[in-house]
Every structure is written in C-alpha cells, then in structure tokens.
Amino acid sequence: MNKYFLAGIISVVTLVLDQVTKIAVREKMVLWTSETVIPGFFNLVHVVNKGAAFGFLNRADITWQRNFFVVVTIIALGAIGMLLKSAEEKDKFQILGLGFVLGGAIGNLIDRILYHQVTDFLDFYYGSHHYPAFNVADIAICLGAFAMIVSFYKNK
C-alpha cells in the first residue's frame, strides 16, 4: 500500500473520530460538567483548553497562545509532510505514526481555529488524583509518537 494512501487513511479516520466525539460532547454536555462512567476511574467531562497538552499555557490572562499554537501546528504539519516524503515505503511504523500525528494535529488545529480552544472530554483518575482531561486527537498524537519511536529503534 502506498505510504501517502496509508498515512492519509489513518489521518482521515483519526480526524473524523476526533471531530465527531468533540461535536457530541459539545452538543450533549454542558461545559464544565462531568458524567461518571466507571466510578473511581473514568468520567466523561466537557472542558476546554486554550493551551497545550496538560494545560500548558491554559491561562485567561494571556491571549496570544491561540495564534502561537496555530502557527506551531502549521509548522509541525509541514515537518510531518517532509518526514512522510522521506519515509521508506516499508517503514510502516513511521508511516502509521505520521498518519496518527497528522490527524490529531489537524483535529486540534480545527478546534483552535473555530473555537479558539480545544475540547477535552476523557477524564481518568484514581481517588482525587485526576490525569489532565484529553481527547481523541491527543491519543492519536501519543500513539503516533510512540510508533515513530518504535520505528527509530527498529531501524537503528
């Protein structure tokens, strides 16, 4: 299978899953609310984040972070394109990884452009210790980064 086709399929599926789940959360849940799914472990929440992963730069007193993250994401998309172009057809881990990162990056970019913030809704916790809420795009970016690390060590 052609590397561009494979990465494209992965990124489109990722993007669709990300946007469909975020739309459902925005339409079905009131902002800043929570619904318990697995008591003591997992909630669905409706929160927004103007910053990056784990709430980095998610502050109301600064307004430039949206434009900053839009520019950084566009630069990253260019880098992903260059990495995909240079990837060998047989390096499926790298190609899959780039597809996941591409879809996730575009998913969060759409939120930043349309809503000036990213919708997060997956809340895992133990007791009172909550992991920062995240979304499908974040999962895809992490999976993609992991696949690219595997590719790097596999080809070393």
UniProtKB/Swiss-Prot annotation:
Main EC class the enzyme belongs to: hydrolase
Coiled coil start-end: none
GO cellular component: plasma membrane
Substrates-to-products reaction catalysed: Release of signal peptides from bacterial membrane prolipoproteins. Hydrolyzes -Xaa-Yaa-Zaa-|-(S,diacylglyceryl)Cys-, in which Xaa is hydrophobic (preferably Leu), and Yaa (Ala or Ser) and Zaa (Gly or Ala) have small, neutral side chains
Membrane topology: Multi-pass membrane protein
UniProt-listed Pfam families: Peptidase_A8
Keyword terms, alphabetized: Aspartyl protease, Cell inner membrane, Cell membrane, Hydrolase, Membrane, Protease, Transmembrane, Transmembrane helix
Localisation: Cell inner membrane
Pathway where this protein functions: Protein modification; lipoprotein biosynthesis (signal peptide cleavage)
EC number: 3.4.23.36
Active-site residues (renumbered): D120, D138
GO biological process terms on file: proteolysis
Role played: This protein specifically catalyzes the removal of signal peptides from prolipoproteins.
PANTHER family documented for this protein: LIPOPROTEIN SIGNAL PEPTIDASE
UniProt-recorded name of the protein: Lipoprotein signal peptidase
Native organism: Maridesulfovibrio salexigens (strain ATCC 14822 / DSM 2638 / NCIMB 8403 / VKM B-1763) (Desulfovibrio salexigens)
